[in-house]
Amino acid sequence: MLKLKFNEEGLIPVIAQDYRTGEVRMLAYANEEAIKKTLETGYAHYYSRSRKKIWKKGETSGELQKVIEVRVDCDEDALIYVIEQEKDRACHTGERNCFFRDIEGNKVEKPLPFEVLPRLQDVIREKIERKEENSYTAKLVSQGKERVFQKFGEEAVETLIALMKGEKEEVIYESADMLYTFLVSLSVSGIDIKEVMEELIRRFK
């Protein structure tokens, strides 16, 4: 293992980054023992500077963080825990991540581009589960899988036509429709977009 550079208190900052969405969930600190426990158990452990003790994230709240990988920065004085966040909340306030405000104190409402597809699939699943009356997605799904797949095919054809016409704005618009219906198709098929991304990673060279 690399020789980490701890501060004068024997701590090192740790960023928890979501494996599925790529978003930064939280920032905390760990000492050598907390890192050891993380590696041994596969679940995120940190060191509480206020309580002066090691704590397992989610031990009481159930918001556990399964650690997929631990990464070290170039100066070896900071870590990233690449995690799968249980209950989809990381912040003690109930927010999905601890960075939910901008520098002016306003709540950040929109995800970053790389978060969009997995976050959008979460919204789609919620609409399907709730069977919302005014939801286009819920209405589409209520017509059956075949109709969902047909709609995806229609949007794919419209995207292809836009590409052939070479009109950038139309391509972007139609691609968004296609991706949305693709996510609906995956959702009704019980497939997470993460699994598609993992297949792309497998092919990455």
UniProtKB/Swiss-Prot annotation:
One of its GO terms (cellular component) is cytoplasm. It comes from the Bacteria. InterPro entries: His_synth_HisIE, HisE, PRA-CH, PRib-ATP_PPHydrolase-like, PRib_AMP_CycHydrolase_dom, PRib_AMP_CycHydrolase_sf. It catalyses: 1-(5-phospho-beta-D-ribosyl)-ATP + H2O = 1-(5-phospho-beta-D-ribosyl)-5'-AMP + diphosphate + H(+); 1-(5-phospho-beta-D-ribosyl)-5'-AMP + H2O = 1-(5-phospho-beta-D-ribosyl)-5-[(5-phospho-beta-D-ribosylamino)methylideneamino]imidazole-4-carboxamide. Residues 1-116 are annotated as: Phosphoribosyl-AMP cyclohydrolase. It is an enzyme of class 3 (hydrolase). Keywords: Amino-acid biosynthesis, ATP-binding, Cytoplasm, Histidine biosynthesis, Hydrolase, Multifunctional enzyme, Nucleotide-binding. Residues 117-205 are annotated as: Phosphoribosyl-ATP pyrophosphohydrolase. Pfam families: PRA-CH, PRA-PH. One of its GO terms (biological process) is L-histidine biosynthetic process. Its EC number is 3.5.4.19, 3.6.1.31. GO terms for molecular function: ATP binding; phosphoribosyl-AMP cyclohydrolase activity; phosphoribosyl-ATP diphosphatase activity. Pathway: Amino-acid biosynthesis; L-histidine biosynthesis; L-histidine from 5-phospho-alpha-D-ribose 1-diphosphate: step 2/9; Amino-acid biosynthesis; L-histidine biosynthesis; L-histidine from 5-phospho-alpha-D-ribose 1-diphosphate: step 3/9. It is found in: Cytoplasm. Gene3D superfamilies: MazG-like (1.10.287.1080), Phosphoribosyl-AMP cyclohydrolase (3.10.20.810). HAMAP family: HisE, HisI, HisIE. PANTHER family: HISTIDINE BIOSYNTHESIS BIFUNCTIONAL PROTEIN, HISTIDINE BIOSYNTHESIS BIFUNCTIONAL PROTEIN HIS7. In the N-terminal section; belongs to the PRA-CH family. This is Histidine biosynthesis bifunctional protein HisIE.
